Amino acid sequence: MRTLITLLLLTTSVLAQSPAELAISSARNVIAKKPAQFSGYNQLAVALARRARETSDVNFYAQAEDVLKKSFELAPANIEGEKVKIWLLLGRHEFAAALAEATALNRQVPDDVLVYGFLTDANVELGNYDAAEKSAQWMLNLRPGNLPALTRAAYLRELFGDNEGALELMNMAYQATPSSEAEDGAWILSQLGHLYFASGQLDKAADALQTALIKFPGYHYALGNLAKVRIQEKRHAEAVVLLQQRYKAAPHAENLYDLAEALELAGHHEEAQRAFTEFETKSLAESVRADNSNRELIFYYADHAHEPAKALTVAEKEFARRHEVFTLDAYAWALHVNGRDAEARKQIATALAVGIRDPQMMRHAERLQRSEVDRMQASSSPGSDKTVVGMETRY
C-alpha cells in the first residue's frame, strides 16, 4: 500500500508551469513587443512543439504550423523557420517529407548540426540506418560532445545492439543537460530507464524513471517505461496505476493499448476488453494519419482479436510507408499469423540483422524459428507426402 501511495504522489503532482509553457509565454511577449520580427514567431513555434512533446498532444503541432506561416510571411524561406518546419514534420511522423526538406536544407547550410540531426531522425524512422549513422557522425565531427548528437548516437547504438555504448552516451547527454531544463532532463532519464530495462537492470531502470518523475511530475514517457519495469517484476497493479496516469496525461490510442494489456495481466478481464474495444475505435480513426498507432493495431488484431487478415492489411499499409525494425517486426508477425512463415522469417531476419535485441522482437524470432523446426519435423515424419516422395526416388 505504501508503494502505491508513493507512486500516486510521484505521478499526480503537477508543475505550476512546464518549461514549454514558460517558453510559450516568453515568445508571446516577444511577439507583442516586436510583431514585425519573424524570429518571435519561430520562437513560439518551437515552444509549441516542445509542449507537444511534453503532453503528447499533436494539436500543439498544428498550432506551431499556423504560427510558422506568419514567420514565412515576414521572412520567406528564413533558415531558422525552415528548421522548425522540419522539426514539425518529424513530430507529425511525416518522415519522408522531413527527409526531403532536411536534405534540401543541408545543401544550403552544410555545417548546421541540427540539420544533420533531422537527417539522422528521418533516416532512422525510415530504416535507412547507414545514412542515419553517417549524419550522426557528422554532428559529432562538427561539434564534439554536443547534446543532440549524443542522444541520437545513443539511440543508434541501441538499434545496433550495443546497449552498453548506448547507456554511456545517454549518461553523457544527461550530464550535459542543464538542471534548469526539467523536461529535457526527464526525457533523457526516461531513455536511460528504458536502456537499463532492456539490459535487465531493473533497479537502475526504476531509479532513473522515478527521478524523471520527480524532475517532471506526471511525465508520460517516464510513466510508460516505469510500467514496463513493474510488469517485468509481476507488480501488475502498480503497472495499471502508472498506465492509467499516462493515458490521462496523454490520451492516445497506443497508450490505451498498453493499459488494456496491463489490465489483462492484472486479471481485470472485462475492463481490459472494454479498453481494447475503445483502442480499436480510436486507432482506426487515426490510421489514415502519419502519426498513428498502426503497430499496436497490428498486434491487437494478431494477438487479441484473432483477426489475422485485418492485421495483415494494416501491416502492409505501414510497411509501404517505412522499413525500420519495429515495422518489420510487426509486418513479420502479421505474416506469421496468416500462415506465411517463410516471408515472416525473412522480415524478422532483416530487422535483427541491424543488431537490435528488443525482447519482443527476439521472442517473435524464436517463435518463427520453432514453427520452421516443427514444419520440417512434420514433413519428414513417416507417412508424410515428402517422406513418400523421398522413398520413391531413392528406390
Where are these regions (language model features)?
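N-terminal leader/linker segments that initiate helical-solenoid repeat arrays
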Residues: 16-80, 91, 100, 370-395
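Residue-level recognition of tetratricopeptide repeat
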Residues: 46, 53, 87, 121, ...
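Structural motif corresponding to the intra-repeat A-B loop/turn of tetratricopeptide repeats
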Residues: 51, 55-58, 92, 126, ...
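Short coil turns that delineate tetratricopeptide repeat
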Residues: 35, 76, 110, 144, ...
